[in-house]
């Protein structure tokens, strides 16, 4: 019966006869009815602390997307790095990769990539270097995946690992947020430059780029950034 419920959910997730979130509620209704799990244990799984942690990350991601705060952060980082490198192609790509990795540590990899693409495409459209587009787009994709390693909420598999690690009872204390960052952030710091060097090794770096100019921060963007900083501080 459990296999049947699992197969039912899988088929509906793929075919989407109802919204995906609605399909996710099937176990909540049918596991108790079929006697596979009591209703309290089933509901407790939906309210697990790690699920709520992931939900909080998604809410922050949505807030940044709606207000456009992510673009302000990205443009500021890219401009800062590019300024140090004379606005050459290699420095622009490094700026995009650093901004993407930094955002991806707190927002899902896919969402971060989608957020960065419009800014990157605007820069590409003003470039005459045919070799510039591919390293930039691949750099954003790679940096998003690398950045997702930095924090537990960077990507859902991190949360799944934390939950499995705690349930295995390998040690008495749970695997904490800060403890994850101590292991994950050095990996991000190491591999972003390595990926950048590999992707840009064929670029001449002679062309300079005009980056989008940052606009003043709106009150909504400031509030989202403050909430983001408070949430990150409390998580750590």
Give residue ranges: language-model regions.
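Functionally constrained cores in energy, signaling, and assembly domains
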Residues: 4, 10, 32, 57, ...
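Hydrophobic transmembrane alpha-helices of multi-pass small-molecule transporters
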Residues: 1-53, 167-170, 179-236
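Hydrophobic transmembrane alpha-helices of multi-pass secondary transporters
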Residues: 5-8, 53, 92, 96, ...
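Membrane-embedded alpha-helical segments and adjacent helix-loop junctions characteristic
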Residues: 22, 26-130
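Juxtamembrane and boundary regions of transmembrane helices in multi-pass small-molecule transporters
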Residues: 60, 66-69, 86, 128-142, ...
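General alpha-helical segment detector with a strong preference for membrane-spanning helices
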Residues: 20, 112-113, 158, 180
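Transmembrane alpha-helix interface/packing and boundary motifs in multi-pass membrane proteins
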Residues: 10-18, 99-108, 141-153, 234-236
């Amino acid at each position: 019966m459990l296999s049947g419920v699992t197969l039912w959910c899988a088929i509906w997730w793929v075919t989407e006869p109802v919204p995906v979130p609605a399909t996710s509620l099937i176990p909540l209704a049918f596991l108790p009815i079929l006697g596979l799990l009591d209703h309290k244990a089933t509901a407790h799984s939906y309210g697990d602390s790690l699920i709520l942690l992931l939900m909080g990350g998604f809410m922050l991601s949505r807030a940044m997307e709606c207000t456009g705060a992510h673009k302000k952060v990205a443009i500021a980082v890219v401009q800062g790095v590019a300024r140090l490198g004379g606005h050459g192609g290699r420095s622009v790509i490094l700026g995009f990769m650093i901004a993407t990795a930094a955002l991806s540590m707190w927002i899902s990899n896919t969402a971060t990539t989608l957020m960065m693409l419009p800014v990157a495409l605007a820069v590409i459209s003003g470039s005459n270097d045919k070799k510039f587009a591919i390293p930039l787009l691949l750099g954003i994709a790679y940096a998003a995946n690398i950045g997702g390693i930095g924090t537990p909420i960077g990507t859902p598999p991190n949360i799944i690992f934390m939950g499995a690690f705690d349930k295995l009872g390998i040690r008495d204390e749970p695997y904490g947020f800060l403890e994850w960052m101590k292991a994950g952030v050095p990996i991000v710091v190491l591999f972003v430059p390595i990926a950048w060097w590999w992707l840009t090794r064929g670029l001449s770096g002679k062309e300079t780029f005009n980056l989008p100019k940052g606009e003043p921060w709106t009150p909504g963007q400031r509030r989202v950034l403050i909430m983001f900083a408070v949430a990150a501080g409390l998580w750590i």
